[in-house]
Amino acid sequence: MQLGAFRNRGVTVPDCLPGFGHINRYWDPEHQVFAAKILPGEFYVTRGNEMIVTTLGSCVSACVRDRRLGVGGMNHFMLPVRGGDPNHWEGDPLSTATRYGNHAMEQLINRVLALGGQRQELEVKLFGGGRVLAGVTDVGKRNIEFAESYVRTEGLRLIGRDLGGQYPRKVQYFPESGRARSKKLLRTRNDTVVRREEHYLHEIDEQPVSGDVDLF
């Protein structure tokens, strides 16, 4: 989004980093900060004083930042179910589920590193993976297992998590400070979240994993 393209009560949304112009960004009066709202399949990275927001059902989000520079971001993804045993993604590094999860994590981490972040300074927080989508397969559990395994295998520093349960949750992340808030949505089943994630799951089950990402 270009400077001056959107105004809210006289506040101009500043330029974002290249490649994130499609992300919905706005002024959040409660926190007095600009916010970027990401949807399933999206990610966002910033080096400024911004808040990244998403609502998770069975999907998971990884919040990653360089703790010294304050550069960081958040993704929002789930593993596709098609191909192999839907209850066991692990054990096959070439499986569709593993490759999709790796891509979701690596595109986020690579952008942080490209902005000057150092791998040894990265810290991670994980959210989501609720049992929200109906079906025999516990999609949320699979997503949690992948995210935790990825962080462990890559030797990343996991400093916080809010995972599992039966409710959707709203997550707010402030990469500059590393602060994160997770609020469970207890009062409603939140059909919007469920429909959005069901549509996303159908899309990723139908589409091939796009591109190979090498972690540097």
From Swiss-Prot:
Example GO BP: chemotaxis
EC top class named in words: hydrolase
Keyword annotations of the record: Chemotaxis, Hydrolase
Protein name: Probable chemoreceptor glutamine deamidase CheD
Keyword hit for Hydrolase: yes
Gene Ontology MF terms: protein-glutamine glutaminase activity
Phylogenetic placement of the source organism: Bacteria, Pseudomonadati, Pseudomonadota, Gammaproteobacteria, Chromatiales
Record-stated family: Belongs to the CheD family.
